[in-house]
Every structure is written in structure tokens, then in C-alpha cells.
Amino acid sequence: MEWTQALIPIVSSCAMTIAAMPLFIGYFQMKKQGQAIREEGPKWHNVKAGTPTMGGLVFLVAAILTGIWVGRPWQNQSTPTLFILLFVLALYGVIGFLDDFIKIFKKRNMGLNSKQKLLGQIIGGIIFYLVYRSEGYPGTLNFFGIELPLGLFYGVFAIFWLVGFSNAVNLTDGIDGLVAGLGTISFATYGIIAWHQQQYDVLVICLSVLGGLLGFFAYNRKPAKIFMGDVGSLALGGLLAAISIMLNQEWTLLLVGLIYVMETASVMLQVTSFKLTGKRIFKMSPIHHHFGMCGWSEWKIDIIFWLVSIVTSLITLWFIW
């Protein structure tokens, strides 16, 4: 794929997102529906109450339509990879959509309970793995260049990977523009890896999501006019995990997605510390809230986290090359 061809899915998905988002925002404003702020959240988030959410639905639809259009499966120009990744994007998006819908329109602030959400994510991971193996893809784990034949245990790993990173991105989505920027960097990185491996279906999906995120960022940067919601964050995390598996570069997500890992680790450490000692390690978790309570502005947190992500992504590409 030439660089000029690579612009097609980016521009297409970005344009659809930019064009549709004002209508989506207008609908929420007309219905007077928006984000509810949890009482245990940061106090400065109270000003965000009522901001439209579920914006991830717009860029997901744009990315899926673009992926189908550019991939042209009806002309037999695509491989099963295209369908598998579109399936993951759609399924985890549906789980997030149900969670958001219950929060906003059913006025139940917690949305799906943790067991319901986890069950949906696990089922999604199981279906992904079964389809993945049925198409003859290898069940070996690439651990920093070392191929580990895990057999059936690779299925357990794949499910854990999708569930873990879908939740990790969801935890990271806590301030204006953060995940939109991180996602742009992550999908650009995997797009480069896919191009290097000549996995063009993966490249098409990466570029389609990248374009959607660029269009979404125009409305999600501080002060955000709309949030992506769980429909966006769960889908992005699940897709990143699936892409790393399809490229047989699972380990790279630990570097490319280092911020997501840090955010999740901060929550786990905070909960463990409080249960064992009654003391908190951070002022608030996930860790972006800790920095916020230390006086950092949202823009400062965004920029520093983006820079860290760029550096770790470049290190990843250096390792692969």
C-alpha cells in the first residue's frame, strides 16, 4: 500500500466522524442527556456534568464502514483478518454501548454491573479465539522475539489479553482528549508494524480507527464537547489487544500501551494497599487523577502521557526493525 492509498481510510473515517458528530452532540443536548459524574470522582469533574457522551459510537461506525469500503470483502480482496478485527471492534463496542445506554437513558449511574460487563468481555474473547484458531492462525506467544508454544493455554492468554486491555483503556479514559490522543499514537504504531509485515487488512483497520480518532479529537479536546464513553474505550482496548495477537506481536502492547498498563496498575496497587494497610499510595486512582490532585492541568497530563506513549512506541518500532 502506497502512502497516498493510506490516506484514503484516514481521511474517509475522519471526515465521516467530523460531519456526524455535531448531529450526535445536538441530539444529546436536545434530549438533555449527558454524562453523570460519580460522587467519588474528582471534584473538578463536576463542571463536566451533562456533557454529551457515547461519542465513540460515531467514530466506531465511521471506522467500520471505512474498513468494509476500503477492504472490499465482496471483491475477495480481504482475508479473514479483516472480519475478525471488525467483529472485535463491533462486539466490544456493543458491550460498551449497553453500559452507556443504561447509565444515561435508564438513569443507572453504574451501567452494567461488573459481572455482566466481565461476562460479555470474556464471551467476546472466547469467540475471537475460536475464530482465530479456526482460520489456522498460530497459537504461539511472541515474548520479546521468543516463540512460546502454549497450546490451549494460548486461548486463556488471548481472552485475558482482550479483557485486560479493554478494561485498561476504559480506566484511562478519564480526562479530556487523553485516550483519543493515546489511541491515535497506538493505532499509528500498529499501522506501521502491519505495513512492515505486509498485513494490509490490519493496516486498513488501524488507519480507519486512526482517522475516526482524529475526527473525534476535534470535539473531545479540552474543553470536551463530548466524551467517547465505554462504547469507545472498551472497543479500542479490545481491538488493540486483538491486533497485537493477529500480528503475533503480543509483547509490543506492553510498550505501545504502557500508559494503559500504568493506569491499571495504579488502580490495582491502590485497592490492594487500602485493603491490606488502610492507606492509599496515590491521592486518587487511576494515576491521571493523582497528577490532577497534585495540581497538574488536564493539558499537562495529556501532553506528558502522549509524549511517554510516543517514546515507548518508537522504542517498540526500533526493536522490531
Swiss-Prot record:
EC number(s) per entry: 2.7.8.13
Cofactor: Mg(2+)
Record localization: Cell membrane
A GO CC term attached to the entry: plasma membrane
InterPro entries: Glycosyl_transferase_4, PNAcMuramoyl-5peptid_Trfase, PNAcMuramoyl-5peptid_Trfase_CS
Source domain of life: Bacteria
Molecular-function annotations in GO: metal ion binding; phospho-N-acetylmuramoyl-pentapeptide-transferase activity
Membrane topology: Multi-pass membrane protein
Keyword entries, A-Z: Cell cycle, Cell division, Cell membrane, Cell shape, Cell wall biogenesis/degradation, Magnesium, Membrane, Metal-binding, Peptidoglycan synthesis, Transferase, Transmembrane, Transmembrane helix
UniProt pathway annotation: Cell wall biogenesis; peptidoglycan biosynthesis
Catalytic reactions on record: UDP-N-acetyl-alpha-D-muramoyl-L-alanyl-gamma-D-glutamyl-L-lysyl-D-alanyl-D-alanine + di-trans,octa-cis-undecaprenyl phosphate = Mur2Ac(oyl-L-Ala-gamma-D-Glu-L-Lys-D-Ala-D-Ala)-di-trans,octa-cis-undecaprenyl diphosphate + UMP
Function: Catalyzes the initial step of the lipid cycle reactions in the biosynthesis of the cell wall peptidoglycan: transfers peptidoglycan precursor phospho-MurNAc-pentapeptide from UDP-MurNAc-pentapeptide onto the lipid carrier undecaprenyl phosphate, yielding undecaprenyl-pyrophosphoryl-MurNAc-pentapeptide, known as lipid I.
Family as reported in the entry's similarity comment: Belongs to the glycosyltransferase 4 family. MraY subfamily.
Name of the protein in its database record: Phospho-N-acetylmuramoyl-pentapeptide-transferase
